[in-house]
């Protein structure tokens, strides 16, 4: 069933129909289309298009259809309807006869699909917020269990300064907190109802759109009909949110892939999230993490594709805008799946504390401590920086750690160095000194964990 046809003297070519139809993907909007239709039926009562009895009959039929859809959403795909709006109307007419043909009075598919998609986005945001929060909780739990796991921190993938595995977990917790905030901001902007804007110029019936918005669960109604049916900012924003969130998860995955490697061996992943090789029996591959990293690209691609689709469109609705759904559906599904999988990875992770500490003690990660020591003795920092660089070269030549160099050797570089330098160069001292807010000292990490728990409460 098509919702148009009187203007045409020939049937659509079957190849065009397959190219044009969107039911194969927009069937996912079925529940939202039904909910929007129930709201619209109530609005039509207020302008005397429907009687109370007719509206109740329509609502009853739509609710029955909603139950069917919730039980088996993929049954919709058996239809040859053009889109989800056509399918709902066709099924409604089957249930209530000609009364079903009155429902679309004053409504266009342009404001209808905009409403459906926003309602769907609101549902998805609620689910994503829950998934993000669950992963934040998993990171905090993992951090709390690994406050004493000292490991190298890196810049340029070179050992830089010692940190803890807990501090690393909390870094990703902060990224996810921003992801959550972005989703909440996106929701504020999209929470306005398009219904009642018609094709582009507004409906010809004196509908109270604010009342209608309330019935549908929106905060308010949109203010300009032309903008409303043209607007897909919320799609771009959600794709941007997903893209940034997936970048965070991809970096999380890359870190753990390295930490899990034989070269680092800081962690071991659970058998539940790894796989083997068909040839090499010793292999335990971090497939879950590699897939998280790999799937990041498809989400970025969806955002780029949507921006390119919209960039040259004149106002108002154009069929190009049908391309807003497949990329969005896939991107949000992917983000949700990756959030879940990241949490599963954390559930079974084992941190190898001795190996982490051994690595943290290598690579001259305490060099900055020696420079700070010299500054405390009155040496200008830039000069201290140069002195320590020379001392590191000597330590490398001798094949020793800085703290293993004899005092006499250290004093060759600066006479102010004394026996009190050795406690300063100890690994625990390196951590303890980073006691400013956000630092890696045990006290600050414990405080950050407590703060994160309060924010999640």
Swiss-Prot record:
Listed InterPro entries: Arg_succ_lyase_C (IPR029419), Argininosuccinate_lyase (IPR009049), Fumarase/histidase_N (IPR024083), Fumarate_lyase_CS (IPR020557), Fumarate_lyase_fam (IPR000362), Fumarate_lyase_N (IPR022761), L-Aspartase-like (IPR008948)
GO molecular function, one term: argininosuccinate lyase activity
Major place of residence: cytoplasm
Entry keyword set: Amino-acid biosynthesis, Arginine biosynthesis, Cytoplasm, Lyase
Entry annotated with the keyword Flavoprotein: no
Example GO biological process: L-arginine biosynthetic process
Enzyme class: lyase
Pathway it works in: Amino-acid biosynthesis; L-arginine biosynthesis; L-arginine from L-ornithine and carbamoyl phosphate: step 3/3
Cited Gene3D superfamilies: Fumarase/aspartase (C-terminal domain), Fumarase/aspartase (Central domain), Fumarase/aspartase (N-terminal domain)
Pfam families documented for this protein: ASL_C2, Lyase_1
Catalytic reaction list: 2-(N(omega)-L-arginino)succinate = fumarate + L-arginine
Location within or outside the cell: Cytoplasm
GO cellular component: cytosol
EC number(s) from the headed UniProt entry: 4.3.2.1
Family annotation (PANTHER family): ARGININOSUCCINATE LYASE
Record-stated family: Belongs to the lyase 1 family. Argininosuccinate lyase subfamily.
HAMAP family: Arg_succ_lyase (MF_00006)
Record's protein name: Argininosuccinate lyase
Gene name of the record: argH
């Amino acid at each position: 069933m098509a919702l148009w046809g009187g203007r045409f003297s020939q049937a659509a070519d079957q190849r065009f129909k397959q190219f044009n139809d969107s039911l194969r993907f927009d069937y996912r909007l079925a529940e939202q289309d039904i909910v929007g239709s129930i709201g619209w039926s109530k609005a039509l009562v207020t302008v005397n298009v429907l009687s109370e009895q007719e509206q109740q009959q329509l609502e009853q039929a739509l609710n029955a259809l909603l139950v069917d859809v919730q039980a088996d959403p993929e049954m919709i795909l058996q239809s040859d309807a053009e889109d989800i709006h056509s399918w709902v109307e066709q099924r409604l007419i089957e249930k209530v006869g000609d009364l079903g043909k009155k429902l679309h009075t004053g409504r266009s598919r342009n404001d209808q699909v905009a409403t459906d998609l926003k309602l769907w986005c609101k549902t998805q945001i609620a689910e994503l917020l829950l998934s993000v929060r669950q992963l934040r909780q998993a990171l905090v739990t993992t951090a709390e269990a690994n406050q004493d796991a000292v490991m190298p921190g890196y810049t340029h993938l070179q050992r830089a300064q010692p940190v803890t595995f807990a501090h690393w977990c909390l870094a990703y917790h902060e990224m996810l907190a921003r992801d959550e905030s972005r989703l909440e901001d996106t929701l504020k902007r999209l929470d306005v109802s398009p219904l009642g804007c018609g094709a582009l110029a507004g409906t010809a019936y004196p509908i109270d759109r604010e009342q209608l918005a309330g019935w549908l669960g929106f905060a308010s109604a949109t203010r300009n009909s032309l903008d409303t049916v043209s607007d897909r900012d919320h799609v771009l924003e959600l794709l941007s949110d997903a893209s940034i969130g997936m970048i965070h998860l991809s970096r999380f995955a890359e870190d753990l892939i390295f930490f899990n490697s034989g070269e680092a061996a800081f962690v071991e992943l659970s058998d539940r999230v790894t796989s083997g090789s068909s040839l090499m029996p010793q292999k335990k591959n971090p497939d879950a993490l590699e897939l998280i990293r790999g799937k990041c690209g498809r989400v970025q691609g969806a955002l780029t594709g949507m921006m390119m689709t919209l960039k040259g469109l004149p106002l108002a609705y154009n069929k190009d805008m049908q391309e807003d759904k497949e990329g969005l559906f896939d991107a949000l599904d992917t983000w949700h799946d990756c959030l879940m999988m990241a949490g599963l990875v954390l559930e079974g992770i084992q941190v190898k504390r001795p190996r982490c500490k051994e690595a943290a003690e290598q690579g001259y990660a305490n060099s900055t401590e020696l420079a700070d020591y010299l500054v405390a003795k009155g040496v200008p920092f830039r000069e201290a920086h140069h002195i320590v660089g020379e001392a590191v070269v000597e330590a490398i030549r001798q094949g020793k750690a800085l703290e293993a160099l004899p005092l006499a050797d250290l004093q060759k570089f600066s006479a102010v160095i004394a026996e009190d330098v050795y406690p300063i160069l100890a690994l625990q001292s390196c951590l303890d000194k980073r006691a400013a807010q956000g630092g890696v000292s045990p006290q600050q990490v414990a405080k950050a964990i407590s703060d994160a728990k309060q924010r999640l409460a």
